[in-house]
Amino acid sequence: MVHDWWNAFVEGFTRTPPLSLPAAEVAWLLAAAAALCLVPVLWRFFGRFVTIVHELGHAFAGLATGMRVTGITLRRDQGGTTLGVGRGRAVWFGFWGYPAPAAVGVGFVAASMQGWGRAALSATVVVLVLTFLFIRNLQGVFILLGAIVAVGVLVVAVPSEVQGHLTLAAGLALILGAVRDWWNLVSVHTTRRRELGSSDAFILARRTGVPAPVWLGSFAAVIGLCAAGAWLALRVAL
């Protein structure tokens, strides 16, 4: 059985025929993505995956600029923290949290449309396993393990002809999840100001002197560009 799982995982890195979807099927996939972000019981779990991508956005941005990532914590309330040290660009590190799910989402959408949806899922498993090296709390271990199992099941147990559709739905859900998290961040700056200390926009404003609304707008702009990119990729299949 393990041998079969391994073969399925390795075969996941091969290309399949590009997706060609009727508009009705795209609508169903979009509805499924919206359900992951709007139905409370589904968001309770999918939101934690969005948080993982958020924190990995910080981590990859830091590593790309020469910082050393010292740890990632994940919490059941969908909170998280990524710490890094070094001479890297702290502003770049701090920026790429909220836009990260949307950036990964448009990547998933584009990959699925070009026949690389199952490869995106297999690559996600690899990234999640490597993330264990940086997790620094027990809750984070269980949250990450749950994500690995969930994506792993999609890789080894779902027929290859369906994996591209699931990757597309996951990509759309990540973009919608980024929008939901951004809106939640806006509420921190308007009606829940007691939580300002945990806001990436607030932290960036303190570091740079650039007002927090500018950072909120910048997050929204990147998320919007990713959504537009996903729409353009989808139009190829319509």
Model-derived features: positions:
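Metalloprotease/metallohydrolase-associated module, dominated by Zn2+-dependent proteases
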Residues: 2-30, 81-237
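N-terminal signal-anchor transmembrane alpha helix
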Residues: 17-55, 229
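Helix-loop junctions at the membrane-solvent interface of multi-pass transporters
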Residues: 38-39, 64, 111, 134
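Small-residue-rich helix-interface/hinge motifs
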Residues: 40-90
